[in-house]
């Protein structure tokens, strides 16, 4: 498993029962505050963070359940034309989506 994938998973685990979110800049994971009114089931990144970092890659987590990308996640990723990752905590699974390559799945990211 790549160091980047492991770093994304570890950043997501720090948020416990809330959806973690942030950006990837180069090989660096940048955790951000989830400003959603319902952070246990959704994530929202402050628009000012997008302007500050100008990211190409966004990550977030699904702390409960075994679902990967939601339809909403894919719609946002497609509209923003960014690469999105979702870490499915209970399954130790990382999914990557881009409009060019579709979805790629990485199992057992942390080997737990």
Name each region found by the language model:
Residues 1-55, 64-112:
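Conserved beta-strand-loop surface patch within small alpha/beta domains used
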Residues 57-59:
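Conserved catalytic cores of phosphodiester-cleaving nucleases, focusing on short active-site segments
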């Amino acid at each position: 498993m790549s160091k980047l994938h492991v770093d994304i998973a570890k950043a997501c685990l720090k948020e416990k029962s809330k959806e973690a979110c942030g950006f990837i800049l180069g090989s660096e994971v940048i955790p951000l505050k989830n400003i959603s009114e319902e952070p246990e089931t959704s994530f929202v990144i402050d628009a000012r963070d997008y302007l500050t970092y100008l990211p190409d890659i966004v990550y977030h987590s699904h702390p409960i359940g075994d679902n990967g990308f939601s339809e909403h996640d894919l719609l946002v990723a497609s509209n923003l034309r960014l690469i999105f990752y979702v870490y499915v905590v209970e399954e130790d699974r990382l999914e990557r989506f881009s409009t060019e390559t579709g979805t790629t799945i990485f199992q057992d990211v942390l080997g737990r």
